[in-house]
Curated annotation (Swiss-Prot):
Record keyword Manganese present: no
GO molecular function terms noted in the UniProt entry: dioxygenase activity; metal ion binding
Protein name: 2-oxoglutarate-dependent dioxygenase traH
Gene: traH
Originating species: Penicillium crustosum (Blue mold fungus)
CC cofactor: Fe(2+)
Consequences of knocking out this gene: Abolished the production of penilactone A, peniphenone D and terrestric acid.
Pathway connected to this protein: Secondary metabolite biosynthesis
Length: 327
């Protein structure tokens, strides 16, 4: 893999678009079988595909981006008051340079230029653990401008996660019922992102450095027209640009799914280079399933590592955290 390898446009040639309606709304077994095969092929080759027909209203997507812009337009000192470093369950604001998405074995790169903000399922303080607890809401934003549109979108994205997880299971030859316990109390972390314009000359610095996602399924919403996501295509040794299109989500598999499938399904390198000349917004939803589960896709796996243990280890590494880290 080379940071300077050629960059090509996707045009559905490398990373396919799959219509979820052909599986979930179809009465044709032929259509359902075709979707299952499309998912299987994409996961075997590079672990990335795009989806349409997902059921998330366009208006909810647009309100989500309006909320993003309202948040990140706040003065930096106000955003830092709700820093994720202040809360052991790690909700809230991430400033520029606070995360290094890139793992050192992928190369020597600077920390990410982006800003972020984590949201999750609302839980009371007496249930606090890593990834579990109350959300942290910016006090300067009205509920209708931020809290409500964000949580409305959160619930929509969570439902997409259930659909994609079912497709992964059936594409591996399992019945959907294998996920019954895994999806009962499924965890998902939503992350609002803002990337600055890529105006620097340092070749080791990116909006988000090349990395693989470490968890389960990522459901990425991109602000239409704000391109920047590039996916490494191993077979052709080049970067593939995935355009930001309205009402089309990018799905990719994380390291946890790759481990669960014994390396059969791929977790693939990707990066963000914001060439728009302005700010770029995106909202990934990291859908992990039951945090106390082990391997829902292989009942014969004898590993004792839980979802929570796996993602906590990876998260802490990216942010330079320990259980005691705080500002």
């Amino acid at each position: 893999m080379s940071v300077d390898a050629a960059v090509v446009k996707n045009e559905d040639k490398y990373i396919p678009t799959i219509d979820l309606r052909d599986y979930f709304d179809a009465y044709s077994e032929e259509k359902r079988a075709k979707v299952i095969e499309q998912v299987r092929k994409a996961c075997l080759e590079h672990g990335f595909f795009q989806v349409e027909g997902h059921g998330v209203p366009v208006e909810s997507q647009r309100r989500m981006f309006a909320a993003c812009k309202a948040l990140f337009d706040l003065p930096l000192e106000k955003k830092r008051r709700i820093s994720l470093y202040k809360y052991s369950w790690r909700r809230g604001y991430e400033g520029p340079g606070e995360q290094q998405a890139n793992d050192p074995h992928h190369g020597d790169f600077e920390r990410d230029a982006k800003e972020g903000f984590f949201v999750g399922k609302e839980l009371p303080l007496d249930q606090v653990d890593f990834g579990k607890g109350p959300n942290v809401w910016p006090p300067d934003l009205a509920e209708n401008d931020f809290h409500r549109p964000v949580m409305e979108y959160y619930e929509h994205a969570r439902k997409v996660g259930f659909k994609v997880m079912e497709l992964l299971a059936v594409s591996l030859g399992h019945p959907p019922s294998i996920l019954k316990d895994f999806t009962t109390d499924a965890a998902m972390f939503l992350k609002l992102l803002r990337y600055p314009a890529h105006t620097w000359t340092d070749t080791r610095k990116f909006g988000s450095g090349q990395h693989t996602d470490y968890g389960g399924i990522t459901i990425l919403l991109q602000d239409p027209g704000q391109d920047g996501l590039e996916v490494w295509h191993e077979a052709t040794q080049q970067w593939v640009e995935l355009p930001a299109l309205e009402d089309k989500f990018v799905i990719n598999l994380g390291d946890m799914v790759q481990r669960w499938t014994g390396g059969k399904y791929k977790s693939t390198l990707h990066r963000v280079i914001n060439k728009t000349g302005g700010e770029r917004y995106a909202v990934p939803a990291f859908w992990h399933g039951d945090l106390d589960a082990k391997n829902p896709l292989d009942p014969n796996d004898t590993s004792d590592e839980t979802v929570l243990e796996f993602i906590k280890k990876k998260f802490y590494k990216g942010y330079g955290l320990t259980d005691d880290t705080s500002l």
